[in-house]
Amino acid sequence: MAVIPAKKRGRPRKSVVAEVPYDSLASPVSENSGSKRPRRNASKKAVANFAQLVHAGRDDVINTTQVNNVDDTDDDDFVLNDEGDGEESDNVEIEFENELESTKNEVADLNSSGSGASVRPSGRRNTVQKLRLKKNSTKNMKSSSPGSSLGQKGRPIRLLKDLSSARDKIERIYGLNKEKLLLLAKVKEGFETSVFDFPFKNIQPDSPYFVCLDPPCKKESAYNKVIGDKNRTVYHEINKTEFENMIKLRTKRLKLLIGEVDAEVSTGDKIEFPVLANGKRRGFIYNVGGLVTDIAWLNIEENTDIGKDIQYLAVAVSQYMDEPLNEHLEMFDKEKHSSCIQIFKMNTSTLHCVKVQTIVHSFGEVWDLKWHEGCHAPHLVGCLSFVSQEGTINFLEIIDNATDVHVFKMCEKPSLTLSLADSLITTFDFLSPTTVVCGFKNGFVAEFDLTDPEVPSFYDQVHDSYILSVSTAYSDFEDTVVSTVAVDGYFYIFNPKDIATTKTTVSRFRGSNLVPVVYCPQIYSYIYSDGASSLRAVPSRAAFAVHPLVSRETTITAIGVSRLHPMVLAGSADGSLIITNAARRLLHGIKNSSATQKSLRLWKWDYSIKDDKYRIDSSYEVYPLTVNDVSKAKIDAHGINITCTKWNETSAGGKCYAFSNSAGLLTLEYLS
């Protein structure tokens, strides 16, 4: 008989046993028993006998005749038990007893058949041994990162569903940086119970849950570098008649129905919210008188001269408001005509609002309004930047008026203009106080230094078509990441230091000419629309981890986020504005997401063709999270489409938000 090594776990590759004495089985086995299982008392004795054989020395042999030409040293499939009495000893004992019983059955079959032919080992033995090998290798694996639980599990992560626990998920998508995880813990603790609203005290600097990551343009003062005395914006004042000759805003009054209250508003009129059916809500509706293409808050955190409650809101207005197919609204070719930007001064505490400036320019329609928060000067309100239909980025100084009297100005020369002769700039974002990254009509991406804007730092192709959105993901713990979305439907993220080797595809969706993408710094994630009815979030360092947030039966057209809290606003083509808490989705596990992730409709615009009347519905409606729903998008009246929505991002006014529809009705509310 073959020699059985001692202190080996598992059953060896045994040679054919020619004869086994009946004494070892306690009772004879009949010849016609075949594959019948032996009686239980024989099984117990067989288990005891084979257990003794395992504990025998290497030179001990079974008292049977050894078969010739059998290599008894082939024991490579054994797993040595060198761990002593480890914590898995009980499980190993059970597995070993099961192995012994299986071996006993095979020996019984050999005796009953009387054949000397070799028998192929059962598949169960190989399975158990593979499981044992896997368990031992996992147990002995050393984690590459201290504190990592994923490294100890040794499981590949390819999809979000592979991260079942919240701890594993957070480790994979955010990393193990303790300072970063501490900030995320503050956000989770302070806002995870805030389903549709949040405490005002949590966004105050003295709150233990206060987290505010400043954008790249705010890192340092850059006014002297970017503008200074050489690049002043040139204006000249005009009167109201001259303005009306250049800009044809709406002249007729708009009929409104707010709750149960009928009203008519002319251009420039403001109406506060009446007492609504679901309670008192603080805010107002302002008739801009044209198509609002974008809005932007100047986030003044500390200003002792005017008070912390005073904020400025810039509103870009087009005079072509009632014709969606007007040739002046084209986006793929260069266009030059007159348009205007209105500057509002507002007290976020009392919600007193006054229009202080109207700036007329000839750059065509403008979008991507952004205040350069690093440009400060005593004579300025701020420095406003935007993309225009001319295919340029323009920077304007907004001069501070001595009074709140409304003035009209004509811009003759901007402070700074960025452009290339080969293609039109379509979108941009800040990389630092002195650099911006731009997307172009031809699919290229470029970086401009504002101190030397004539030639870009780089000019590389990323897409094959018109780039719709560029957004920078900034963090104190990783390099800045840039995302781009184009008409072809590709969503890429990359490190601008090395685009070729870092470009990663986040997703691919159907092509569209409206795919909003914004960066939410509190959860280090991009919030974006798929060009249709779904709102999603993806961390910038884990492109595979796409989290659905909201699914609607209409196209999502505008997204608003804040650096102070994780609440996300989403406007849609059917006139709805909804709010959801993205932190509840990203900072929890993937299980029961439909129960924890909800969204709330705040407002809904409607339009009656028969009565030529706009109605705003203030009733709340809760939507559950649904995934993979069939799109049921409908065609709605163009006047109710939400064109833009923005949070105020200051501690004093952090609960204020504004949004506008295509009819030029600007709505502002203080969330309470």
Curated annotation (Swiss-Prot):
Its main location: nucleus. Residues 24-45, 67-156 are annotated as: Disordered. GO terms for biological process: 5S class rRNA transcription by RNA polymerase III; transcription by RNA polymerase III; transcription initiation at RNA polymerase III promoter. Residues 159-672 are annotated as: Sufficient for interaction with TFC8. GO terms for cellular component: nucleus; transcription factor TFIIIC complex. The keyword Nucleus applies. InterPro entries: GTF3C_component, WD40/YVTN_repeat-like_dom_sf, WD40_repeat_dom_sf. Residues 6-18 bind DNA. It comes from the Eukaryota. GO terms for molecular function: DNA binding; RNA polymerase III general transcription initiation factor activity. Keywords: Disulfide bond, DNA-binding, Nucleus, Transcription, Transcription regulation. Present with 1130 molecules/cell in log phase SD medium. Heterodimer with TFC8. Component of the TFIIIC complex composed of TFC1, TFC3, TFC4, TFC6, TFC7 and TFC8. The subunits are organized in two globular domains, tauA and tauB, connected by a proteolysis-sensitive and flexible linker. Interacts with TFC1, TFC3, TFC4 and directly with TFC8. TFIIIC mediates tRNA and 5S RNA gene activation by binding to intragenic promoter elements. Upstream of the transcription start site, TFIIIC assembles the initiation complex TFIIIB-TFIIIC-tDNA, which is sufficient for RNA polymerase III recruitment and function. Part of the tauB domain of TFIIIC that binds boxB DNA promoter sites of tRNA and similar genes. Cooperates with TFC3 in DNA binding. This is Transcription factor tau 91 kDa subunit.
